[in-house]
Amino acid sequence: MADMDYLAARLLLLSGNPFCGMPKASEAIEKIMKLFLVVEAKISRNEELSAKELKKYSHNLINLADKVETICPMQLRGEWKKHLEELQKSYDMRYPDKWANKMEWKSDIDNLDSIYAYLRQNISKNFPAEERPTADRFGGNIISAYNDEIVEKIEEAGMLSPINLLSKKNKQRDKFNAP
């Protein structure tokens, strides 16, 4: 689901709709970090994280990034922390009671592509060597949920296929494990 949310966020942002695209991007980043926590608990400690345990992180990207970094050292600070804060702000502003008199939406698709590609690539690489083959399945082909029949129907309807959507204006395209 994280990959589908990421592709949906790209589509919305490329279509000039940051009001929906940025919260969807936030959800994609949240889901991939929570997925890491679930996979890490299962592989490293043979624990099943419950929905309740995951909910304690709420939708707070900064808290999630902090938790992920305590488990596997990554570079989620600096400019990316600012981007995570922008995504968090956009997620919080989904409802009118959170709107300010002047809303600013900073939609930087290049940053979204960079951080999402980085998370997908590096989370599994930070598992211990003996656990990496199992963790690598986590960062598999980004469009694997779409079989040939689904892609054909998407294209017949005149829509962008997932691979075309992933490739459109994406400087990080080569970092995704996709055909």
Language-model region placement:
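Long, charged low-complexity segments
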Residues: 41-179
